[in-house]
């Protein structure tokens, strides 16, 4: 039996690099997204952005707020497309309860980290996060610089 050709490249649609810098990430979850047809087409074209995105809870459901998916020009024109509409996150009841408990604690929030393809479905990686103070961000930057410097010194010693 012949194997199917797999597409080369990454399955990642969009990353939220800002979240890793602005927040201290704790527990991570994988959630599905309830999307319409034009949104899936736009994501296949790489038109998604989750930089300023966050998760809210309404009626014991999780919703992705301020996620931007730009419509394609060739998308259907007989209905209005809203690039910033709220999108429902598909999670188990146990996971939603765990996330809501964390948000009710002081200083915690839920932020999306990545959008990616898993098989033929769009998945969103979300994390329970706590906001960093300015001095925490500076410390993270110092640690990152020190790791780079260590790598540089190690490579120089190898020569």
UniProtKB/Swiss-Prot annotation:
Location within or outside the cell: Cytoplasm
Biological processes annotated in GO: trans-translation
Region (Disordered): 137-159
Keyword Cytoplasm: yes
A Gene Ontology term for the protein's cellular component: cytosol
Keywords: Cytoplasm, RNA-binding
The organism's place on the tree of life at top rank: Bacteria
Subcellular location, principal: cytoplasm
Single GO MF annotation: RNA binding
Family membership noted in the UniProt record: Belongs to the SmpB family.
Function: Required for rescue of stalled ribosomes mediated by trans-translation. Binds to transfer-messenger RNA (tmRNA), required for stable association of tmRNA with ribosomes. tmRNA and SmpB together mimic tRNA shape, replacing the anticodon stem-loop with SmpB. tmRNA is encoded by the ssrA gene; the 2 termini fold to resemble tRNA(Ala) and it encodes a 'tag peptide', a short internal open reading frame. During trans-translation Ala-aminoacylated tmRNA acts like a tRNA, entering the A-site of stalled ribosomes, displacing the stalled mRNA.
Protein's UniProt name: SsrA-binding protein
Organism from which the protein derives: Cellvibrio japonicus (strain Ueda107)
């Amino acid at each position: 039996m012949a194997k199917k050709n797999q597409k080369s490249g990454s399955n990642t649609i969009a990353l939220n690099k800002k979240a890793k810098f602005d927040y201290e990430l704790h527990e991570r979850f994988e959630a599905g997204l309830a999307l319409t047809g034009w949104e899936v087409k736009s994501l296949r074209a790489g038109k998604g952005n989750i930089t300023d995105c966050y998760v809210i809870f309404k009626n014991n459901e999780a919703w992705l707020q301020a996620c931007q998916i730009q419509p394609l020009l060739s998308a259907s024109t007989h209905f209005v497309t809203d690039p910033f509409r709220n999108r429902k996150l598909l999670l188990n009841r146990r996971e939603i309860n765990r996330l809501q408990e964390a948000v009710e604690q002081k200083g915690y929030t839920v932020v999306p980290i990545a959008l990616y393809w898993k098989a033929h479905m769009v998945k969103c990686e979300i994390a329970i996060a706590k906001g960093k103070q300015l001095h925490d961000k500076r410390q993270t930057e110092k640690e990152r610089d020190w790791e780079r410097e260590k790598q540089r010194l190690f490579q120089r010693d190898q020569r």
